From Swiss-Prot:
It is found in: Cytoplasm. GO terms for cellular component: cytoplasm. The keyword ATP-binding applies. Signal peptide: none annotated. Its EC number is 6.3.2.8. It comes from Hahella chejuensis (strain KCTC 2396). It catalyses: UDP-N-acetyl-alpha-D-muramate + L-alanine + ATP = UDP-N-acetyl-alpha-D-muramoyl-L-alanine + ADP + phosphate + H(+). ATP binds at G121, T122, H123, G124, K125, T126, T127. This is UDP-N-acetylmuramate--L-alanine ligase.
Amino acid sequence: MKNTVWGPPEMRRIRRIHFVGIGGSGMCGIAEVLLNQGYEISGSDLKESATTRRLSDMGASITFGHTAQNIAGANVVVTSSAVAKDNPEVTAANEQRIPVIARAEMLAELMRYRHGVAIAGTHGKTTTTSLMASVLGEAGLDPTFVIGGRLNSAGTNAKLGASRYLVAEADESDASFLHLTPMVSVVTNIDADHMHTYGGDFEKLKQTFVDFLHNLPFYGVAVMCYDDPVVREIIPRVGRSVITYGFNEKADVRAVDIAQQGMQTSFTAKRPGGHPDLRISLNMPGKHNVLNALAVIAVATDEGIADEAIVSALNKFQGVGRRFQVYGNYPVDEGSVMLVDDYGHHPREVDATIKAIRDGWPEKRLVAVFQPHRYTRTRDLYEDFVQVLSKVDVLVLMDVYPAGEKEIPGADGRSLCRSIRQRGQLDPIFIERGQDVKAVLSGVLQDGDLLLTQGAGDIGAVAGVLAEGGLQ
C-alpha cells in the first residue's frame, strides 16, 4: 500500500543543534519545531524566561551566559542578528569548523521541502502569520508554523504540523529573508526601518523586497498590499503572479462596509473570479488588522480553502500575545481603567494603535506609557515619534530600550520628552525606570481612562506587573 504519511527529509549528519540566544522571539520557535522533529537541541541565553523554561521542559538543554563550552557536541550553531560576531560560542564554533548559520537559513531548511507561506513586511507580520496558521488549522490542514509572538489559541509561537504547509514570518531587518524559498509570499507594507542593514538607502530596501519575491518559483504567487504606496510602486518590478489586497477599489481582494465597536471590527471581503463576498467579524480593533485579515483571505482563496473555514477561523481568532492584548479593567479611585499592552515600536504602528483606540473607544481618555526601542530607530524616526506620540492625552515616556546598542546623544528618552513638550500639545512625564511607572500613574489615572503600555523592550513586563498588582 502507498505510504501517505509525509515527513521532511532529515538533515544529514546533524544530530545536535545549538542556538545562541535561544530565548529570542525568532529563535525559540525554530528550536521548538526541530525539537519536535527529534533533533537534540541545546541553547544559551543571558537570562531565564518563560520561553527558555518551556523549551527546557520539552527536553532542550539550556545554559545561561555565553561560553565556548556551551557548544560541546553541536553539529551546527544557529545565531540571530542580535548575536555579536565575537560571541565566545560563535568564535569557538568557527575555530572548531562547526557551521555557524543565521536563523533564517535554518528556517529555510525547514521550508525547503514544504509548501511555504512566508509573511514579509515592516508591520503586521506576526498577526498575519498567526491568522494564516489559524485558517489553515481550521481547514484541517494542520500546518507547521513559526511566529514571532505567542498565538493565544495554541499557547505557543511554534508548532510542528503533519501537513506540507509551513507558515512563517520573513524577516527583512537583516535581509535574511532572502534565504527563504516559499511557494507563497505576502508583503504587508514597506517602511523605513532597520535602515542600517541597507546602508540608509531606501531604494536598496525596496529592491531587496523584489529580490525576496523573486525567490518564489515561477508558479508561486506574491500577495501584496495595494494600499501601501511603496508596495504598490514595486508591483511592476515583480516577475511573478501577483494578487493585491486593500481598501482601494483597484485591489483584487478588498474590504468594504467596515465598522468598529470596541474590540470588534467587522467588514465585507470582496473577491475576484466569482467568489462570493465574505462577512467577517474580527476580535481585533483597527483598520490595520482588516488589512492583515485581507492578506490571509487572498492566500486562502487562492489555495482553495473552503469559505466556511476562512470565516470561522477569522471570527474565532483570539489574538497574539502583546498585540493589543487587553488585560481587563482595573480599579482606580472612584472608578476603573482599561489596561492594554502592545508591541508596536515604529511610529506607523503607534499611530495605527492610537487610531484603533480612538475609533473603538472614542469617549475614553488615552493614557500611554511608551518605551522607545533602539537608539538608531529613535534617531532615524525622531520627528515621526514626536508627531505621533503627541496624539495621546497623557504620555509617560520611558528611556530607550537599547537592545544592545550604544547610546546616541540626542536620541534618548529625555530628548524625545523635551521635543514633545516643545511641540506644545501635551506635557509628557519622563521616567528612567520601569518600576516607577505605577507610582507616576497613580497621580494621573482617572475613571474611564484607557491605559496603553507600548514598546518592543521590557515594557511588556511592566504591563504584566501592573496587571498582577493592580493600579492602586
